[in-house]
Every structure is written in structure tokens, then in C-alpha cells.
Amino acid sequence: MVQTLNQKQKEFFYHILHLVKTTDKPFYYFLSGGAGVGKSHLIKSLYQAALKYYNSRAGEDFNEVKILLLAPTGKAAFGIKGNTIHSTLAIPASQSLKIYKPLDSNRLNTLRCKLGAVKLIFLDEISMVGNTMFNVQINNRLKDSILSTQMPKTYLFL
């Protein structure tokens, strides 16, 4: 897939892959661009390369979820072969965005087990995610479920 990236995409691809392989500190990137410029294609390429890297390391469990591919809508999630933010992070679609409702202990433990090994998060179509959804719902759910056990190294918002 890397061969199909343009020069700027390749530069970004290799930069992120280098960071994934060499740094233990969390890093955050926001990648923007108009419709049809290849952001989702870049996500797919980075996902494949990072997954190959993580699974090649000694002692890695192939069944653990290491990378989240998230999007705000089913159509966007389908486009990157990922899942919706709501379904992955157990955020009810009917819930008021301004009020965060923590999960009960059983559901939270299930989510922690499912996402405990996550190292990399891609959030596609970030422009469709409102400030309240991002800061109240996503941020708090990640703090409750993933960040309390092991902080992912990388977040890419596209």
C-alpha cells in the first residue's frame, strides 16, 4: 500500500512509523485536508504497517487489539474497515453529549479487557466530531477504560 501513497503521504507515513517503533512517549497528530486527498487511504496504510510491526515483536498476543480504527459514523467506519466511536467506546447514541455517564463496573471491566493493549488510535473524519463529544465523551471514556491501565502511545486525528 505504501507504493500508492504520494510523496507527502509517504513522508508522513514514515515519520509516524518511525515514532511508533522508536519512542515510548505519547504523541498526537492532527492531519487535515480536503475531501478525496487520501487521508483514509493513509490510515489504511499506517494501520497495516503498524499492525505488522506490533505483531512481529516477540511475545505479542495476536488476539489483543493494539490499534483502534474509529470514525463517528457507520459509513466512515466502514470506509476504513473500523468501528464507530460509539460502539467501540460504549457511548450510547441517545446520551446527552454534555453529561458524561460512566459505565457500571461490569461493562467498564469488559471494555478495559478489550482495549487494555491498545497502543495506537486512529480517529477518521474528526471534523464530524463535535467539541463536546470529543472533550466530554471520548476523552472521559478513554481515561476510564484505556488510560487507567496503559496509555496508548499514539493518537492520529484525520
What is each residue range found by the language model?
Residues M1-L158:
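Conserved ATP-binding/catalytic motifs of P-loop helicase motor domains
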